[in-house]
Amino acid sequence: MSFKSIFLTGGVVSSLGKGLTAASLALLLERQDLKVAMLKLDPYLNVDPGTMNPYEHGEVYVTDDGVETDLDLGHYHRFSSVQLSKYSTATSGQIYTKVLTKERNGEFLGSTVQVIPHVTNEIINVIQSCADHHKPDILIVEIGGTIGDIESLPFLEAVRQFRCEHPQDCLSIHMTYVPYLRAAKEIKTKPTQHSVQNLRSIGISPDVILCRSEAPLSTEVKRKISLFCNVPEHAVFNAIDLERSIYEMPLLLAKENISDFLLNKLGFSPKPLDLSDWQDLVEALCDKERQHVRIGLVGKYLEHEDAYKSVFESLFHASVPANCSLELVPIAPESEDLLEQLSQCDGCLIPGGFGTRSWEGKISAARYCRERNIPCFGICLGMQALVVEYARNVLDKPLANSMEINPETPDPVVCMMEGQDSVVKGGTMRLGAYPCRIAPGSLASAAYKTDLVQERHRHRYEVNPSYIERLEEHGLKIAGVCPLGELCEIVEIPNHRWMLGVQFHPEFLSKLAKPHPLFIEFIRAAKAYSLEKANHEHR
Protein backbone atom coordinates (compact mmCIF):
# COMPACT_ATOMS: atom_id res chain seq x y z
CA MET A 1 0.00 0.00 0.00
CA SER A 2 1.39 3.41 -0.98
CA PHE A 3 0.09 5.25 2.07
CA LYS A 4 -0.18 4.80 5.82
CA SER A 5 -3.44 5.14 7.78
CA ILE A 6 -4.21 6.46 11.25
CA PHE A 7 -7.68 5.65 12.58
CA LEU A 8 -9.00 7.82 15.42
CA THR A 9 -11.87 6.60 17.60
CA GLY A 10 -13.42 7.97 20.77
CA GLY A 11 -14.77 6.38 23.92
CA VAL A 12 -16.41 6.99 27.31
CA VAL A 13 -18.17 10.24 26.33
CA SER A 14 -18.87 12.30 23.22
CA SER A 15 -17.40 15.77 22.53
CA LEU A 16 -13.89 14.67 23.46
CA GLY A 17 -12.29 16.82 20.79
CA LYS A 18 -11.43 14.12 18.25
CA GLY A 19 -11.73 16.65 15.43
CA LEU A 20 -9.27 19.04 17.08
CA THR A 21 -6.95 16.13 17.82
CA ALA A 22 -7.05 14.91 14.22
CA ALA A 23 -6.42 18.45 12.95
CA SER A 24 -3.52 18.92 15.36
CA LEU A 25 -1.96 15.61 14.33
CA ALA A 26 -2.22 16.71 10.70
CA LEU A 27 -0.30 19.89 11.52
CA LEU A 28 2.43 17.96 13.36
CA LEU A 29 2.81 15.43 10.55
CA GLU A 30 2.92 18.15 7.89
CA ARG A 31 5.76 19.77 9.82
CA GLN A 32 7.62 16.49 9.20
CA ASP A 33 7.37 17.19 5.44
CA LEU A 34 4.70 14.56 4.95
CA LYS A 35 1.61 14.96 2.80
CA VAL A 36 -1.52 14.36 4.86
CA ALA A 37 -5.10 13.66 3.80
CA MET A 38 -8.08 13.54 6.13
CA LEU A 39 -11.39 11.70 6.13
CA LYS A 40 -14.34 12.09 8.51
CA LEU A 41 -16.74 9.13 8.77
CA ASP A 42 -20.05 10.12 10.37
CA PRO A 43 -22.44 7.37 11.55
CA TYR A 44 -25.68 9.34 11.19
CA LEU A 45 -28.16 8.34 8.49
CA ASN A 46 -28.52 11.80 6.96
CA VAL A 47 -26.88 11.92 3.54
CA ASP A 48 -25.10 15.10 4.63
CA PRO A 49 -25.59 17.74 7.36
CA GLY A 50 -26.95 20.30 4.88
CA THR A 51 -30.56 20.03 6.07
CA MET A 52 -29.81 19.37 9.74
CA ASN A 53 -30.81 21.78 12.49
CA PRO A 54 -27.80 23.93 13.55
CA TYR A 55 -28.86 23.50 17.18
CA GLU A 56 -28.40 19.75 16.77
CA HIS A 57 -25.37 19.55 14.55
CA GLY A 58 -23.60 22.90 14.55
CA GLU A 59 -22.45 24.67 11.42
CA VAL A 60 -22.29 23.14 7.96
CA TYR A 61 -18.80 23.49 6.52
CA VAL A 62 -18.59 23.80 2.72
CA THR A 63 -15.63 22.63 0.63
CA ASP A 64 -14.37 24.14 -2.63
CA ASP A 65 -16.13 21.46 -4.64
CA GLY A 66 -19.47 22.27 -3.00
CA VAL A 67 -19.89 19.47 -0.47
CA GLU A 68 -21.80 20.22 2.75
CA THR A 69 -19.83 18.60 5.55
CA ASP A 70 -19.34 18.24 9.28
CA LEU A 71 -17.83 21.17 11.20
CA ASP A 72 -14.78 19.02 12.04
CA LEU A 73 -13.58 19.59 8.48
CA GLY A 74 -13.39 23.26 9.41
CA HIS A 75 -10.94 22.31 12.17
CA TYR A 76 -8.91 20.30 9.65
CA HIS A 77 -8.71 23.35 7.39
CA ARG A 78 -7.86 25.88 10.10
CA PHE A 79 -4.99 23.86 11.58
CA SER A 80 -3.39 22.28 8.54
CA SER A 81 -2.81 22.55 4.81
CA VAL A 82 -4.83 19.47 3.86
CA GLN A 83 -6.94 19.64 0.73
CA LEU A 84 -10.58 18.89 1.53
CA SER A 85 -13.10 17.61 -1.01
CA LYS A 86 -16.04 15.29 -1.47
CA TYR A 87 -13.58 12.46 -0.80
CA SER A 88 -12.91 13.84 2.71
CA THR A 89 -16.31 12.97 4.18
CA ALA A 90 -18.83 10.16 4.25
CA THR A 91 -21.95 9.41 6.28
CA SER A 92 -23.95 6.27 6.89
CA GLY A 93 -26.64 7.88 4.75
CA GLN A 94 -24.27 8.15 1.79
CA ILE A 95 -22.92 4.64 2.30
CA TYR A 96 -26.36 3.01 2.45
CA THR A 97 -27.58 5.08 -0.52
CA LYS A 98 -24.69 3.79 -2.63
CA VAL A 99 -25.29 0.20 -1.54
CA LEU A 100 -29.03 0.35 -2.23
CA THR A 101 -28.46 2.04 -5.61
CA LYS A 102 -26.11 -0.78 -6.59
CA GLU A 103 -28.68 -3.33 -5.44
CA ARG A 104 -31.40 -1.70 -7.56
CA ASN A 105 -29.04 -1.68 -10.55
CA GLY A 106 -28.39 -5.39 -10.14
CA GLU A 107 -24.68 -4.96 -9.39
CA PHE A 108 -24.77 -7.58 -6.62
CA LEU A 109 -26.06 -10.22 -9.06
CA GLY A 110 -28.94 -11.31 -6.86
CA SER A 111 -26.92 -11.72 -3.66
CA THR A 112 -28.53 -11.08 -0.30
CA VAL A 113 -27.35 -7.56 0.56
CA GLN A 114 -25.98 -7.40 4.09
CA VAL A 115 -24.00 -5.07 6.35
CA ILE A 116 -21.10 -7.50 6.02
CA PRO A 117 -19.72 -7.58 3.36
CA HIS A 118 -21.61 -5.05 1.26
CA VAL A 119 -21.80 -2.04 3.59
CA THR A 120 -18.33 -2.62 5.01
CA ASN A 121 -16.88 -3.00 1.50
CA GLU A 122 -18.41 0.34 0.56
CA ILE A 123 -16.80 1.97 3.61
CA ILE A 124 -13.44 0.48 2.64
CA ASN A 125 -13.96 1.87 -0.88
CA VAL A 126 -14.50 5.33 0.64
CA ILE A 127 -11.22 5.08 2.56
CA GLN A 128 -9.35 3.89 -0.52
CA SER A 129 -10.96 6.54 -2.77
CA CYS A 130 -9.86 9.32 -0.42
CA ALA A 131 -6.28 8.05 -0.59
CA ASP A 132 -6.41 7.54 -4.37
CA HIS A 133 -7.67 11.08 -4.92
CA HIS A 134 -5.40 12.99 -2.51
CA LYS A 135 -2.36 10.65 -2.74
CA PRO A 136 -1.08 11.26 0.81
CA ASP A 137 1.81 9.80 2.72
CA ILE A 138 -0.53 9.48 5.71
CA LEU A 139 -4.33 9.34 5.76
CA ILE A 140 -6.00 10.32 9.06
CA VAL A 141 -9.49 8.84 9.42
CA GLU A 142 -11.70 10.18 12.21
CA ILE A 143 -14.67 7.97 13.08
CA GLY A 144 -17.55 9.94 14.54
CA GLY A 145 -19.57 8.86 17.53
CA THR A 146 -18.53 6.92 20.61
CA ILE A 147 -17.47 3.30 21.01
CA GLY A 148 -20.60 1.43 22.05
CA ASP A 149 -22.92 3.33 19.71
CA ILE A 150 -24.76 0.90 17.46
CA GLU A 151 -24.50 3.32 14.51
CA SER A 152 -20.68 3.11 14.49
CA LEU A 153 -20.42 -0.68 14.26
CA PRO A 154 -20.24 -0.99 10.43
CA PHE A 155 -17.45 1.61 10.32
CA LEU A 156 -15.47 -0.13 13.04
CA GLU A 157 -15.87 -3.49 11.31
CA ALA A 158 -14.63 -1.92 8.07
CA VAL A 159 -11.61 -0.52 9.92
CA ARG A 160 -10.94 -3.95 11.43
CA GLN A 161 -10.97 -5.53 7.98
CA PHE A 162 -8.79 -2.78 6.52
CA ARG A 163 -6.24 -3.23 9.32
CA CYS A 164 -6.20 -6.99 8.75
CA GLU A 165 -5.44 -6.45 5.06
CA HIS A 166 -2.70 -3.87 5.76
CA PRO A 167 -1.32 -4.65 9.23
CA GLN A 168 2.00 -2.85 8.72
CA ASP A 169 0.42 0.29 7.30
CA CYS A 170 -2.28 1.07 9.87
CA LEU A 171 -2.36 2.49 13.35
CA SER A 172 -5.27 2.95 15.75
CA ILE A 173 -5.58 5.81 18.25
CA HIS A 174 -8.32 5.52 20.85
CA MET A 175 -9.21 8.74 22.64
CA THR A 176 -10.90 8.43 26.02
CA TYR A 177 -11.92 10.54 28.99
CA VAL A 178 -10.23 9.99 32.35
CA PRO A 179 -12.42 11.64 35.01
CA TYR A 180 -11.24 13.15 38.27
CA LEU A 181 -13.59 12.58 41.23
CA ARG A 182 -13.20 15.60 43.46
CA ALA A 183 -14.91 13.98 46.45
CA ALA A 184 -12.50 11.05 46.41
CA LYS A 185 -9.62 13.15 45.06
CA GLU A 186 -8.85 10.35 42.61
CA ILE A 187 -8.39 9.94 38.89
CA LYS A 188 -10.45 7.00 37.64
CA THR A 189 -9.19 4.78 34.83
CA LYS A 190 -12.04 2.25 34.83
CA PRO A 191 -14.09 4.03 32.09
CA THR A 192 -11.03 3.95 29.83
CA GLN A 193 -10.46 0.27 30.57
CA HIS A 194 -14.06 -0.58 29.68
CA SER A 195 -13.96 1.52 26.51
CA VAL A 196 -10.81 -0.24 25.31
CA GLN A 197 -12.32 -3.64 26.18
CA ASN A 198 -15.35 -2.72 24.09
CA LEU A 199 -13.15 -1.71 21.17
CA ARG A 200 -11.07 -4.89 21.43
CA SER A 201 -14.26 -6.99 21.49
CA ILE A 202 -14.99 -5.60 18.03
CA GLY A 203 -11.55 -6.77 16.89
CA ILE A 204 -9.54 -3.54 17.09
CA SER A 205 -6.67 -3.33 19.56
CA PRO A 206 -5.55 0.29 19.84
CA ASP A 207 -1.87 1.11 19.31
CA VAL A 208 -2.20 4.42 21.15
CA ILE A 209 -4.46 5.58 23.97
CA LEU A 210 -4.90 9.34 24.19
CA CYS A 211 -6.41 10.34 27.52
CA ARG A 212 -8.39 13.54 27.83
CA SER A 213 -8.31 14.81 31.42
CA GLU A 214 -8.69 17.91 33.57
CA ALA A 215 -5.19 17.60 35.02
CA PRO A 216 -1.94 15.89 33.96
CA LEU A 217 -1.87 12.13 34.46
CA SER A 218 0.81 10.76 36.74
CA THR A 219 3.23 8.04 35.67
CA GLU A 220 1.37 5.67 37.98
CA VAL A 221 -1.96 6.33 36.23
CA LYS A 222 -0.39 5.88 32.79
CA ARG A 223 1.18 2.64 33.96
CA LYS A 224 -2.20 1.39 35.16
CA ILE A 225 -3.87 2.24 31.85
CA SER A 226 -1.02 0.53 30.02
CA LEU A 227 -1.39 -2.63 32.10
CA PHE A 228 -5.15 -3.03 31.83
CA CYS A 229 -5.50 -1.84 28.23
CA ASN A 230 -2.63 -3.91 26.83
CA VAL A 231 -0.60 -1.08 25.30
CA PRO A 232 2.99 -0.06 26.10
CA GLU A 233 3.33 2.64 28.73
CA HIS A 234 5.03 4.94 26.22
CA ALA A 235 1.91 4.60 24.00
CA VAL A 236 -0.33 6.23 26.62
CA PHE A 237 -0.54 9.97 25.98
CA ASN A 238 -2.29 12.76 27.84
CA ALA A 239 -4.37 15.62 26.42
CA ILE A 240 -5.26 17.89 29.32
CA ASP A 241 -8.05 20.45 29.04
CA LEU A 242 -6.88 23.61 27.26
CA GLU A 243 -7.23 26.74 29.35
CA ARG A 244 -6.59 29.48 26.78
CA SER A 245 -7.21 28.41 23.20
CA ILE A 246 -7.92 25.35 21.07
CA TYR A 247 -4.84 26.31 19.04
CA GLU A 248 -2.66 25.13 21.94
CA MET A 249 -3.55 21.53 21.07
CA PRO A 250 -0.66 20.95 18.58
CA LEU A 251 1.77 22.37 21.14
CA LEU A 252 0.38 20.07 23.82
CA LEU A 253 0.64 16.98 21.61
CA ALA A 254 4.13 17.99 20.49
CA LYS A 255 5.18 18.19 24.13
CA GLU A 256 3.90 14.62 24.55
CA ASN A 257 6.08 13.57 21.55
CA ILE A 258 3.13 11.76 20.03
CA SER A 259 4.14 12.50 16.43
CA ASP A 260 7.55 10.81 16.94
CA PHE A 261 5.80 7.72 18.27
CA LEU A 262 3.36 7.61 15.35
CA LEU A 263 6.09 8.08 12.76
CA ASN A 264 8.32 5.38 14.23
CA LYS A 265 5.36 3.02 14.42
CA LEU A 266 4.50 3.66 10.76
CA GLY A 267 8.08 3.33 9.51
CA PHE A 268 9.01 6.98 9.04
CA SER A 269 12.06 8.73 10.47
CA PRO A 270 11.04 11.69 12.67
CA LYS A 271 12.74 15.04 12.18
CA PRO A 272 13.22 17.81 14.76
CA LEU A 273 9.89 19.57 15.21
CA ASP A 274 9.89 23.37 15.11
CA LEU A 275 6.59 24.94 16.19
CA SER A 276 8.01 28.33 17.20
CA ASP A 277 5.93 30.17 14.60
CA TRP A 278 2.75 28.45 15.82
CA GLN A 279 3.70 29.21 19.42
CA ASP A 280 4.09 32.90 18.52
CA LEU A 281 0.64 32.96 16.89
CA VAL A 282 -0.96 31.33 19.94
CA GLU A 283 0.74 33.77 22.32
CA ALA A 284 -0.43 36.72 20.23
CA LEU A 285 -3.96 35.32 20.08
CA CYS A 286 -4.10 34.84 23.86
CA ASP A 287 -2.51 38.19 24.77
CA LYS A 288 -5.16 39.96 26.85
CA GLU A 289 -2.98 43.08 27.22
CA ARG A 290 -3.78 44.20 23.68
CA GLN A 291 -6.49 46.78 23.03
CA HIS A 292 -9.92 45.42 23.93
CA VAL A 293 -12.47 45.36 21.08
CA ARG A 294 -16.11 44.24 21.45
CA ILE A 295 -17.86 42.68 18.44
CA GLY A 296 -21.61 42.13 18.56
CA LEU A 297 -22.87 39.04 16.73
CA VAL A 298 -26.50 39.42 15.73
CA GLY A 299 -27.38 35.83 14.80
CA LYS A 300 -30.23 33.38 14.90
CA TYR A 301 -28.49 30.36 16.45
CA LEU A 302 -26.29 31.96 19.11
CA GLU A 303 -27.42 29.57 21.86
CA HIS A 304 -25.25 26.94 20.18
CA GLU A 305 -21.72 28.29 19.63
CA ASP A 306 -20.87 25.58 17.10
CA ALA A 307 -23.55 26.95 14.75
CA TYR A 308 -21.17 29.80 13.87
CA LYS A 309 -17.87 28.05 14.64
CA SER A 310 -15.99 29.23 11.55
CA VAL A 311 -17.22 32.82 12.01
CA PHE A 312 -16.08 32.90 15.64
CA GLU A 313 -12.68 31.45 14.77
CA SER A 314 -12.20 33.81 11.81
CA LEU A 315 -12.76 36.82 14.06
CA PHE A 316 -10.16 35.55 16.52
CA HIS A 317 -7.73 34.84 13.65
CA ALA A 318 -8.09 38.45 12.47
CA SER A 319 -7.40 39.82 15.95
CA VAL A 320 -3.75 38.75 15.63
CA PRO A 321 -2.74 40.98 12.66
CA ALA A 322 -5.14 43.67 13.95
CA ASN A 323 -3.28 43.52 17.28
CA CYS A 324 -6.29 43.56 19.57
CA SER A 325 -8.03 41.36 22.11
CA LEU A 326 -11.56 40.39 21.06
CA GLU A 327 -14.68 40.01 23.12
CA LEU A 328 -17.53 38.43 21.16
CA VAL A 329 -20.94 39.58 22.38
CA PRO A 330 -23.86 37.33 21.29
CA ILE A 331 -26.96 39.46 20.65
CA ALA A 332 -30.32 37.81 19.97
CA PRO A 333 -32.07 39.68 17.12
CA GLU A 334 -35.37 39.39 19.01
CA SER A 335 -33.95 41.16 22.09
CA GLU A 336 -35.90 44.18 23.26
CA ASP A 337 -32.60 45.88 24.08
CA LEU A 338 -30.94 44.94 20.77
CA LEU A 339 -29.91 48.50 19.94
CA GLU A 340 -28.75 49.21 23.48
CA GLN A 341 -26.47 46.17 23.33
CA LEU A 342 -25.15 47.25 19.93
CA SER A 343 -24.37 50.73 21.25
CA GLN A 344 -21.84 49.14 23.61
CA CYS A 345 -20.01 47.33 20.79
CA ASP A 346 -17.24 48.49 18.48
CA GLY A 347 -18.49 46.52 15.50
CA CYS A 348 -21.39 44.34 14.41
CA LEU A 349 -21.34 41.09 12.46
CA ILE A 350 -24.55 39.67 11.00
CA PRO A 351 -23.90 36.04 9.99
CA GLY A 352 -25.81 33.74 7.66
CA GLY A 353 -28.94 31.77 8.39
CA PHE A 354 -32.29 30.69 7.00
CA GLY A 355 -35.95 31.43 7.68
CA THR A 356 -38.07 34.30 8.93
CA ARG A 357 -37.27 34.24 12.64
CA SER A 358 -34.95 37.08 13.69
CA TRP A 359 -35.03 38.69 10.22
CA GLU A 360 -36.42 42.05 11.29
CA GLY A 361 -33.94 42.21 14.17
CA LYS A 362 -31.07 41.84 11.73
CA ILE A 363 -32.48 44.64 9.60
CA SER A 364 -32.78 46.86 12.69
CA ALA A 365 -29.14 46.11 13.53
CA ALA A 366 -28.06 46.99 9.99
CA ARG A 367 -29.94 50.30 10.10
CA TYR A 368 -28.51 51.20 13.51
CA CYS A 369 -24.95 50.57 12.29
CA ARG A 370 -25.47 52.45 9.02
CA GLU A 371 -27.00 55.52 10.65
CA ARG A 372 -24.44 55.67 13.48
CA ASN A 373 -21.38 54.87 11.37
CA ILE A 374 -20.55 51.67 13.31
CA PRO A 375 -18.41 49.07 11.46
CA CYS A 376 -20.72 46.33 10.19
CA PHE A 377 -20.05 43.09 8.32
CA GLY A 378 -22.92 41.08 6.77
CA ILE A 379 -22.38 37.51 5.58
CA CYS A 380 -24.80 35.68 3.23
CA LEU A 381 -28.24 36.38 4.79
CA GLY A 382 -26.49 39.20 6.66
CA MET A 383 -25.62 40.88 3.36
CA GLN A 384 -29.21 40.48 2.21
CA ALA A 385 -30.36 42.19 5.41
CA LEU A 386 -28.03 45.11 4.65
CA VAL A 387 -29.48 45.45 1.14
CA VAL A 388 -33.13 45.21 2.23
CA GLU A 389 -32.55 47.79 4.98
CA TYR A 390 -30.95 50.12 2.45
CA ALA A 391 -33.86 49.71 0.04
CA ARG A 392 -36.42 50.41 2.77
CA ASN A 393 -34.80 53.48 4.28
CA VAL A 394 -32.67 55.03 1.54
CA LEU A 395 -34.62 54.09 -1.61
CA ASP A 396 -37.83 54.78 0.36
CA LYS A 397 -39.28 51.32 -0.34
CA PRO A 398 -40.79 50.52 3.10
CA LEU A 399 -42.22 47.17 1.94
CA ALA A 400 -38.98 45.96 0.37
CA ASN A 401 -38.07 42.46 1.45
CA SER A 402 -36.50 39.16 0.55
CA MET A 403 -38.72 36.65 -1.22
CA GLU A 404 -37.50 34.07 1.29
CA ILE A 405 -39.22 36.09 4.02
CA ASN A 406 -42.23 37.37 2.08
CA PRO A 407 -42.84 35.82 -1.35
CA GLU A 408 -45.59 38.41 -2.00
CA THR A 409 -43.50 41.53 -1.33
CA PRO A 410 -44.09 44.32 -3.88
CA ASP A 411 -40.36 45.08 -3.86
CA PRO A 412 -38.41 41.80 -3.94
CA VAL A 413 -34.96 43.33 -3.51
CA VAL A 414 -33.66 39.83 -2.75
CA CYS A 415 -35.03 37.05 -4.95
CA MET A 416 -34.53 33.36 -5.51
CA MET A 417 -31.81 32.52 -7.99
CA GLU A 418 -32.84 31.03 -11.30
CA GLY A 419 -33.23 27.26 -11.06
CA GLN A 420 -33.32 27.21 -7.25
CA ASP A 421 -37.06 26.55 -6.84
CA SER A 422 -36.49 22.82 -6.30
CA VAL A 423 -38.66 20.85 -3.90
CA VAL A 424 -35.60 18.78 -2.97
CA LYS A 425 -33.65 20.78 -0.39
CA GLY A 426 -30.56 18.65 0.20
CA GLY A 427 -27.50 19.61 -1.86
CA THR A 428 -29.41 21.83 -4.31
CA MET A 429 -28.18 25.30 -3.28
CA ARG A 430 -25.42 27.27 -4.99
CA LEU A 431 -22.55 25.50 -3.27
CA GLY A 432 -18.77 25.66 -3.38
CA ALA A 433 -16.14 28.01 -4.76
CA TYR A 434 -16.98 30.59 -7.42
CA PRO A 435 -14.92 33.50 -8.77
CA CYS A 436 -15.62 37.08 -7.71
CA ARG A 437 -14.36 40.12 -9.62
CA ILE A 438 -13.48 42.99 -7.25
CA ALA A 439 -14.25 46.63 -8.09
CA PRO A 440 -11.15 48.88 -7.96
CA GLY A 441 -11.10 51.54 -5.26
CA SER A 442 -13.47 49.60 -3.00
CA LEU A 443 -13.08 48.44 0.60
CA ALA A 444 -12.95 44.90 -0.76
CA SER A 445 -10.14 45.84 -3.14
CA ALA A 446 -8.16 47.41 -0.28
CA ALA A 447 -8.57 44.18 1.70
CA TYR A 448 -7.89 41.60 -1.02
CA LYS A 449 -5.25 43.61 -2.94
CA THR A 450 -6.25 41.77 -6.11
CA ASP A 451 -9.06 42.03 -8.65
CA LEU A 452 -10.19 38.38 -8.77
CA VAL A 453 -10.78 35.98 -5.86
CA GLN A 454 -12.39 32.59 -5.25
CA GLU A 455 -14.87 32.30 -2.37
CA ARG A 456 -17.18 29.54 -1.11
CA HIS A 457 -20.96 29.85 -1.26
CA ARG A 458 -24.08 28.30 0.25
CA HIS A 459 -27.28 30.10 -0.75
CA ARG A 460 -30.45 30.07 -2.85
CA TYR A 461 -31.22 33.79 -2.91
CA GLU A 462 -29.44 36.76 -4.48
CA VAL A 463 -29.74 40.52 -4.74
CA ASN A 464 -32.41 41.05 -7.41
CA PRO A 465 -30.58 42.18 -10.60
CA SER A 466 -33.50 44.45 -11.54
CA TYR A 467 -32.88 46.58 -8.41
CA ILE A 468 -29.11 46.92 -8.67
CA GLU A 469 -29.13 50.05 -10.84
CA ARG A 470 -31.49 51.88 -8.44
CA LEU A 471 -29.44 50.78 -5.42
CA GLU A 472 -26.28 52.12 -7.05
CA GLU A 473 -28.00 55.40 -7.97
CA HIS A 474 -28.77 55.88 -4.28
CA GLY A 475 -25.20 55.27 -3.16
CA LEU A 476 -24.84 51.53 -2.58
CA LYS A 477 -21.65 50.25 -4.20
CA ILE A 478 -21.57 46.85 -5.86
CA ALA A 479 -17.96 46.01 -5.02
CA GLY A 480 -17.86 42.44 -6.27
CA VAL A 481 -19.65 40.37 -8.90
CA CYS A 482 -19.36 36.82 -10.14
CA PRO A 483 -18.06 36.89 -13.75
CA LEU A 484 -20.22 33.83 -14.44
CA GLY A 485 -23.53 35.66 -14.76
CA GLU A 486 -22.78 38.98 -13.01
CA LEU A 487 -24.35 37.88 -9.71
CA CYS A 488 -23.89 40.47 -6.96
CA GLU A 489 -21.30 39.16 -4.47
CA ILE A 490 -20.17 42.20 -2.42
CA VAL A 491 -21.94 45.42 -1.45
CA GLU A 492 -20.49 48.45 0.37
CA ILE A 493 -21.61 51.83 1.60
CA PRO A 494 -18.86 54.24 0.45
CA ASN A 495 -19.49 57.11 2.88
CA HIS A 496 -19.36 54.88 5.92
CA ARG A 497 -16.55 53.99 8.31
CA TRP A 498 -16.72 50.32 7.22
CA MET A 499 -19.95 48.67 6.12
CA LEU A 500 -19.69 45.69 3.80
CA GLY A 501 -21.78 42.65 2.94
CA VAL A 502 -20.79 39.48 1.10
CA GLN A 503 -23.00 36.80 -0.42
CA PHE A 504 -20.32 34.15 0.14
CA HIS A 505 -18.82 32.67 3.32
CA PRO A 506 -15.29 34.03 3.85
CA GLU A 507 -15.09 32.26 7.21
CA PHE A 508 -14.56 28.93 5.40
CA LEU A 509 -11.14 30.08 4.13
CA SER A 510 -9.68 31.68 7.25
CA LYS A 511 -6.83 30.07 9.20
CA LEU A 512 -4.88 31.15 12.27
CA ALA A 513 -1.75 31.23 10.11
CA LYS A 514 -3.58 33.05 7.30
CA PRO A 515 -6.58 35.12 8.48
CA HIS A 516 -9.11 36.16 5.86
CA PRO A 517 -8.45 39.74 4.63
CA LEU A 518 -12.08 40.88 5.01
CA PHE A 519 -12.14 39.82 8.66
CA ILE A 520 -8.82 41.60 9.23
CA GLU A 521 -10.11 44.88 7.79
CA PHE A 522 -13.38 44.59 9.70
CA ILE A 523 -11.56 44.12 13.02
CA ARG A 524 -9.16 46.95 12.19
CA ALA A 525 -12.11 49.24 11.52
CA ALA A 526 -13.74 48.20 14.82
CA LYS A 527 -10.46 48.81 16.64
CA ALA A 528 -10.15 52.29 15.12
CA TYR A 529 -13.74 53.06 16.12
CA SER A 530 -13.03 51.85 19.65
CA LEU A 531 -10.01 54.15 19.91
CA GLU A 532 -12.02 57.06 18.54
CA LYS A 533 -14.74 56.51 21.15
CA ALA A 534 -12.16 56.26 23.93
CA ASN A 535 -10.44 59.48 22.85
CA HIS A 536 -13.78 61.27 22.65
CA GLU A 537 -14.71 60.15 26.18
CA HIS A 538 -11.41 61.41 27.60
CA ARG A 539 -11.75 64.92 26.19
Swiss-Prot record:
Pathway(s) per entry: Pyrimidine metabolism; CTP biosynthesis via de novo pathway; CTP from UDP: step 2/2
Superkingdom of source: Bacteria
Keywords of the record: ATP-binding, Glutamine amidotransferase, Ligase, Magnesium, Metal-binding, Nucleotide-binding, Pyrimidine biosynthesis
One GO BP: 'de novo' CTP biosynthetic process
Keyword Membrane: no
Domain Glutamine amidotransferase type-1, chain residue ranges per copy: 294-532
GO molecular-function term, one example from the UniProt record: ATP binding
Annotated CTP binding sites: 14, 149-151, 188-193, 224
CDD domains documented for this protein: CTPS_N, GATase1_CTP_Synthase
Annotated segments matching region Amidoligase domain: 1-268
Positions with a binding annotation for L-glutamine: 55, 353, 381-384, 404, 460
EC number(s) from the headed UniProt entry: 6.3.4.2
UniProt-annotated binding residues for UTP: 14, 188-193, 224
Catalytic activity: UTP + L-glutamine + ATP + H2O = CTP + L-glutamate + ADP + phosphate + 2 H(+); L-glutamine + H2O = L-glutamate + NH4(+); UTP + NH4(+) + ATP = CTP + ADP + phosphate + 2 H(+)
Residues reported to bind ATP: 15-20, 72
Annotated catalytic residues: 380 (nucleophile), 505, 507
Binding locations of Mg(2+): 72, 142
Record flagged with keyword DNA damage: no
Notes on how activity is controlled: Allosterically activated by GTP, when glutamine is the substrate; GTP has no effect on the reaction when ammonia is the substrate. The allosteric effector GTP functions by stabilizing the protein conformation that binds the tetrahedral intermediate(s) formed during glutamine hydrolysis. Inhibited by the product CTP, via allosteric rather than competitive inhibition.
Gene3D superfamilies for this protein: 3.40.50.880, P-loop containing nucleotide triphosphate hydrolases (3.40.50.300)
Record's GO cellular component terms: cytosol
Misc: CTPSs have evolved a hybrid strategy for distinguishing between UTP and CTP. The overlapping regions of the product feedback inhibitory and substrate sites recognize a common feature in both compounds, the triphosphate moiety. To differentiate isosteric substrate and product pyrimidine rings, an additional pocket far from the expected kinase/ligase catalytic site, specifically recognizes the cytosine and ribose portions of the product inhibitor.
Complex and partners: Homotetramer.
Family: Belongs to the CTP synthase family.
Described purpose of this protein according to its UniProt entry: Catalyzes the ATP-dependent amination of UTP to CTP with either L-glutamine or ammonia as the source of nitrogen. Regulates intracellular CTP levels through interactions with the four ribonucleotide triphosphates.
Record protein name field: CTP synthase
Species whose genome carries this gene: Chlamydia trachomatis serovar A (strain ATCC VR-571B / DSM 19440 / HAR-13)
